[in-house]
Amino acid sequence: MKAIITVVGKDKSGIVAGVSGKIAELGLNIDDISQTVLDEYFTMMAVVSSDEKQDFTYLRNEFEAFGQTLNVKINIQSAAIFEAMYNI
């Protein structure tokens, strides 16, 4: 399983640490990561994977709830969606 995680919110310390900790807690591996601050806003994109089958509804709910604790918006989408878009 491969997925794309995006994080957007007002910049503050601890966002990368918190999100990467949650990724590890959910049994996902970070394959690639990029983050930047645009004006006062933090943005991050990570490619994550797992050898095990993952329930995307569960992951989506977990990241949504966790994002609220950091006051950021966290999204997770299957990488297969992006691969299908470019293989038409």
Curated annotation (Swiss-Prot):
It comes from the Bacteria. This is UPF0237 protein SP_0238. NCBIfam families: PRK00194.1. SUPFAM superfamilies: ACT-like. Homodimer. Belongs to the UPF0237 family. InterPro entries: ACT-like_dom_sf, ACT_dom, UPF0237/GcvR_regulator, UPF0237_ACT. It holds the Pfam family ACT_6. It comes from Streptococcus pneumoniae serotype 4 (strain ATCC BAA-334 / TIGR4). Residues 4-77 form the ACT domain.
